[in-house]
């Protein structure tokens, strides 16, 4: 069922036990977040038990601080999510499809995010999962309902360094993302934010991209490579075309 204006208007909006105004959108098999501009002045939105695959496409909601999305299909988070819901403090993503540690990167810009739940996602089985989230999203104080300890923060820093000088392990993890990238923001009017463009890489191009990320000398260089991929562009040094032209020249000689 689409998240239509009519569905939002007919859904229950109430003051919950925490004295927050909450919009109940549970259990409608909603595939895409859309039309939320009509749902003004909400403190919390409950999307539990739907079919949402991408977390994004929110209007500017400075008041929203709690999102409940357990038992959906979320596998992608819009990189610009922090610009639309900047005051989010609690995000529950239990039983979704987040797969890679680097797929969580957009959450690092939610500087008020203190409570994060990722239980029953494939990403939780990754090595160093908890330390990575603690390092990459330092605002988080409770991860999967467990308080983040100072010793864990120290261990995370030991493993991954700092944002300015990440370790080789951190750089490697930042380069491994699911093969789905955001459509450029310029196309937002033509396509919902949850739709994505897949960058089709040959095996050689994929290996070159991974090598470029491993050999990157700064976080800024890694960010540039990520941006090119997010925009649907293959980084210049990874293109097969140059190699093909060399092969053609050799054949002609």
From Swiss-Prot:
- Give the superkingdom in one word: Eukaryota
GO BP, sorted A to Z: mRNA splicing, via spliceosome
Q: Name one GO cellular component term.
A: post-mRNA release spliceosomal complex
Keywords attached to this Swiss-Prot or TrEMBL record, sorted alphabetically, are: Leucine-rich repeat, mRNA processing, mRNA splicing, Nucleus, Repeat, Spliceosome
- Which ranges carry the LRRCT domain? 121-159
Query: Is the Metal-binding keyword given for this protein?
Result: no
Extract the GO molecular function terms from the UniProt entry.
U2 snRNA binding
LRR repeat windows = 19-40, 41-62, 63-84, 87-108
Compositionally biased residues, Acidic residues: 241-253
Q: Does the keyword Isomerase belong to this entry?
A: no
Q: Where are the annotated segments for Disordered?
A: 228-253
Cellular location of this protein? Nucleus
Q: What is its main location?
A: nucleus
- Pfam families under this entry? LRR_9 (PF14580)
PANTHER family with a match to the protein in the record = U2 SMALL NUCLEAR RIBONUCLEOPROTEIN A
Q: How does it assemble?
A: Associated with the spliceosome.
Free-text function comment from the UniProt entry = Involved in pre-mRNA splicing.
Membership in a protein family: Belongs to the U2 small nuclear ribonucleoprotein A family.
Q: What is this protein called?
A: U2 small nuclear ribonucleoprotein A'
Its organism's taxonomic lineage begins at:
Eukaryota, Fungi, Dikarya, Ascomycota, Pezizomycotina
Gene of origin?
Answer: lea1
């Amino acid at each position: 069922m689409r998240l239509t204006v009519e569905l939002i208007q007919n859904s229950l909006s109430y003051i919950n036990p925490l004295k927050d105004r909450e919009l109940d959108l549970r259990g409608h098999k909603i595939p895409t977040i859309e039309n939320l501009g009509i749902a003004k002045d909400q403190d919390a939105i409950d999307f539990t038990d739907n079919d949402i695959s991408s977390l994004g496409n929110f209007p500017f909601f400075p008041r929203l601080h709690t999102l409940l999305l357990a038992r959906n299909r979320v596998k992608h988070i819009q990189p610009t999510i922090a610009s639309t819901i900047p005051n989010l403090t609690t995000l529950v993503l239990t039983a979704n499809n987040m797969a890679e540690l680097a797929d969580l990167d957009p959450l690092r810009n939610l500087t008020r995010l203190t409570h994060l739940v990722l239980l029953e996602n494939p990403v939780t089985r990754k090595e160093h999962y908890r330390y990575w989230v603690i390092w990459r999203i330092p605002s988080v104080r409770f991860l999967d309902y467990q308080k983040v300890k100072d010793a864990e923060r120290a261990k995370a820093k030991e493993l991954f360094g700092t944002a300015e000088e990440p370790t080789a392990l951190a750089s490697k993890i930042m380069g491994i993302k699911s093969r789905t990238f955001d459509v450029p923001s310029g196309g937002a009017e033509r396509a919902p934010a949850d739709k994505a463009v897949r960058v089709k890489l040959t095996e050689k191009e994929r290996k070159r991209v991974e090598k470029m990320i491993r050999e990157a000398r700064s976080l800024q260089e890694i960010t540039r490579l990520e941006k090119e991929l997010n925009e649907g562009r293959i980084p210049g040094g990874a293109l097969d075309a140059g190699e093909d032209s060399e092969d053609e020249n050799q054949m002609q000689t």
